[in-house]
């Protein structure tokens, strides 16, 4: 069958059309159309570049009008550079911190001394102040090999989402084992800033993160709690790539868990995202909803500890004041598990979990 009409390309084309026509992304077909150079299609000088620095520079200037050209260059250098001794997970966690909390740049104080300040890379408060571009068939050159990706989604020039698509009749696990794993080996720098990986054959879809094994890629099949489950690709795209949802996921629903001496990147599952956001809305209206805030119920093994972390972190980040969060358990083992999760996911500010465990009423009052 001719390339222009192959089934996987039709899935790819329909993906780009949904992103562009329904969700408001700009769509670019780069396969044999990309013009390299600063004034080219995407502003890439070479196929090795994975950050669209032209678009990143414009975003930094738009979000931080105070930045000088020197500071813009410094910020871009921090966003794109890494040490060869770093693992992919270490790089990814570092870049995620810049995306979420701002990239450090040097600023001169009136007294002549310098200080480090954070420049925003994303505008989480105003969705329309960000630029969303979905690029199909983008050639990326690694140290040895070159690969052509199906769809890469950029926000402010940063490649946040990698989408691998297969034919309807193929098992989507092949997208993981045959394609994604190969890209990790051949063009690993594409995943330095990656927030999430989507794998689909159109009829079935899963999403995961850098470092996730196949069994930890999950379906995203509901847009609201009342929806019937639908595992097809359009549901996942609408649930994750809607601009407001993507920025919310990026800001509030990604964790790096340092338990057990290793680091695991956690993206909220569909039910956690919906449930936590419902709980956040209840907290927002807590005064008028006193006595009927509701219960966020979990089955065993569905991630209740992470849901607590997501909820606590979003409330602390999005609301004024310093809310006190009390976690009650009915077993010492569960008490330790949840407190360790809070510590290992960075919610305790570097302090040890045991400092926050209350053993009596007096402890709790303190």
Model-derived features: positions:
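ATP-dependent helicase/translocase motor core
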Residues: 2-324, 333-349
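Conserved H-loop
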Residues: 330
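Inter-Walker segment of RecA-like/P-loop motor cores
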Residues: 343-366
């Amino acid at each position: 069958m001719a390339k222009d009409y192959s089934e996987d390309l039709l899935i790819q084309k329909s993906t780009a059309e949904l992103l562009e026509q329904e969700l408001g992304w700009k769509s670019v077909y780069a396969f044999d159309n990309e013009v390299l150079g600063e004034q080219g299609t995407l502003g890439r000088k070479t196929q090795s570049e994975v950050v669209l620095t032209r678009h990143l520079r414009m975003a930094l200037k738009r979000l931080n009008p105070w930045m000088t050209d020197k500071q813009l260059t410094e910020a871009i250098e921090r966003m794109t550079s890494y040490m060869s001794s770093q693992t992919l997970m270490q790089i990814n966690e570092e870049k995620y911190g810049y995306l979420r909390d701002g990239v450090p740049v040097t600023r001169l104080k009136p007294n002549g001394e310098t200080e480090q300040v954070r420049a925003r890379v994303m505008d989480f408060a105003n969705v329309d102040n960000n630029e969303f571009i979905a690029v199909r068939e983008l050639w990326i050159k690694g140290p040895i090999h070159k690969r052509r990706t199906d769809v890469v989604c950029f926000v402010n020039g940063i490649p946040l989402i990698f989408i691998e698509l297969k034919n309807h009749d193929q098992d989507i696990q092949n997208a993981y084992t045959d394609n994604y794993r190969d890209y990790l080996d051949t063009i690993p720098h594409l995943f330095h800033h990656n927030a999430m990986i989507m794998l689909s054959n159109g009829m079935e879809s899963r999403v995961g993160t850098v470092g996730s094994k196949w069994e930890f890629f999950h379906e995203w099949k509901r847009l609201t709690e009342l929806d019937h489950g639908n595992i097809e690709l359009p549901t996942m795209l609408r649930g994750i790539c809607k601009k407001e949802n993507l920025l919310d996921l990026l800001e509030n629903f990604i964790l790096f868990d340092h338990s057990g001496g290793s680091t695991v990147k956690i993206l909220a599952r569909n039910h956690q995202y919906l449930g936590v956001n419902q709980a956040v809305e209840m907290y927002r209206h807590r005064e008028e909803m006193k006595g009927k805030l509701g219960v966020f119920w979990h089955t065993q093994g569905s991630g209740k500890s992470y849901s607590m972390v997501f909820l606590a972190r979003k409330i602390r980040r999005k609301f004024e004041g310093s809310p006190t969060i009390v976690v009650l358990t009915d077993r010492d083992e569960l008490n330790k598990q949840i407190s360790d999760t809070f510590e290992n996911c960075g919610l305790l500010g570097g302090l040890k979990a045991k400092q926050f465990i209350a053993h009596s009423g007096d402890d709790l009052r303190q």
